[in-house]
Amino acid sequence: MINVEIVRNYNKWREYKQINKSLIKKITQNILLRFDNFSKIKQFELSILLTNAAEILTLNKQFRNIEKATNVLSFPSNELNWQDLYSKLEFLDDSDYMHLGDIAFCYEVIYNESCEQHKTFENHFIHLLIHSILHLIGFDHQNDTEANIMENLEIEILSYFGIFPPY
């Protein structure tokens, strides 16, 4: 089971009713089911903040020391490593609960990017959600190898949902 908590701190998000708990659960489940190591966990939790440029700028400055609005910020609750996800070793403790982390999305930046990239707002949001969940479970793009692995997984998941890959 995946429990999703959504906080909408900006009214423009209400225009996108399709961005809801059901969509977020479906995408999260699709990602987690790809890794056997998550199979013992019975309950996952994920917190989502749908906000504006002013708040994301504050968060970005506070947590990353970058004074600029960004499209999305991911705050993992666990220190996972993507390489462990592919091993048959059980790297998780015996807990049947896992809080994956928190994700904050910025409406204005996502809207502007979707217009510039000629994508629908929803499809761009879904791509950023997939990207963020992958960060929460230990994926990163600090070097070309990691970036390629993460991008290929994003493409695979986006294709599953019928969304053309952005790369």
Swiss-Prot record:
Main localization, broad class: cytoplasm
Pfam families reported for this sequence: YbeY (PF02130)
Keywords recorded for this protein, A-Z: Cytoplasm, Endonuclease, Hydrolase, Metal-binding, Nuclease, Ribosome biogenesis, rRNA processing, Zinc
Lineage top rank: taxon: Bacteria
Cofactor annotation: Zn(2+)
Gene Ontology MF terms in the entry: metalloendopeptidase activity; RNA endonuclease activity; zinc ion binding
Gene3D superfamilies per record: Metalloproteases ('zincins'), catalytic domain (3.40.390.30)
E.C. numbers: 3.1.-.-
One Gene Ontology term, aspect cellular component: cytoplasm
Residue positions binding Zn(2+): 131, 135, 141
One annotated GO biological process: rRNA processing
UniProt xrefs under InterPro entries: MetalPrtase_cat_dom_sf_prd, YbeY, YbeY_CS
Function: Single strand-specific metallo-endoribonuclease involved in late-stage 70S ribosome quality control and in maturation of the 3' terminus of the 16S rRNA.
Recorded family membership: Belongs to the endoribonuclease YbeY family.
PANTHER family in the record: ENDORIBONUCLEASE YBEY, CHLOROPLASTIC (PTHR46986:SF1)
The protein's name in its UniProt record: Endoribonuclease YbeY
Source organism: Rickettsia africae (strain ESF-5)
